[in-house]
């Protein structure tokens, strides 16, 4: 409704006007920019577009699914039907952030395998079969975060991650290796 109102009143595409949505989680914009969406590759390129898909298949060295994935709401519906039996939750806490937390906790608890990668032992992590302790982006990791206004901010480590905590990219890289997939470099510049 707000988007429609902004369009109707001419407040889109003009300097100093428009909407800046408040997102529910940190770095949602940056995640979308990098392709962490069920229907988009990096740069918001459509998964269902054969030309886009072929370009990323060449870069990734793998055949990619030509169909859109499902978003969180549909994932919980699929859990309820028994169609989704495992989940890897990275930097989210759906056991506390979903609208119906009791229902979310029941569904997460019923999975055959729940893996959580997070900086805290969240309620979701408490339900997990496997927990990967991650480092904090703002103080312990090298990379970028993007605000809702699309301002990209560089982050550099100021301290070493505590205990067994590791950078997200290092955890994902090792998981790939253990599954026989070379995810390439772990350098954030790539």
Where are these regions (language model features)?
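Non-catalytic alpha/beta scaffold blocks inside enzyme catalytic domains
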Residues: 1-15, 20-189
């Amino acid at each position: 409704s707000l988007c429609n109102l902004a369009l109707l009143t001419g407040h889109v595409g003009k300097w100093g006007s428009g909407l800046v949505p408040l997102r529910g989680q940190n770095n949602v914009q940056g995640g979308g920019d990098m392709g962490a969406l069920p229907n988009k590759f990096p740069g918001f390129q459509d998964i269902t577009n054969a030309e886009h898909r072929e370009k990323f298949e060449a870069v990734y060295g793998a055949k990619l699914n030509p169909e859109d994935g499902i978003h969180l709401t549909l994932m919980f519906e699929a859990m309820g039907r028994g169609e989704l039996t495992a989940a890897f939750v990275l930097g989210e806490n759906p056991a506390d952030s979903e609208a119906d937390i009791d229902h979310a906790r029941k569904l997460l608890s019923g999975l055959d395998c729940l893996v959580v990668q997070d900086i805290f032992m969240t309620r979701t992590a408490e339900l997990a079969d496997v927990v990967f302790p991650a480092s904090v982006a703002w103080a312990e990791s090298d990379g970028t975060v993007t605000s809702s206004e699309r301002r990209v901010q560089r982050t550099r480590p100021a301290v070493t991650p505590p205990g067994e905590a590791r950078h997200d990219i290092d955890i994902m890289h090792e998981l790939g290796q253990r599954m026989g997939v070379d995810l390439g470099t772990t350098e954030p510049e790539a």
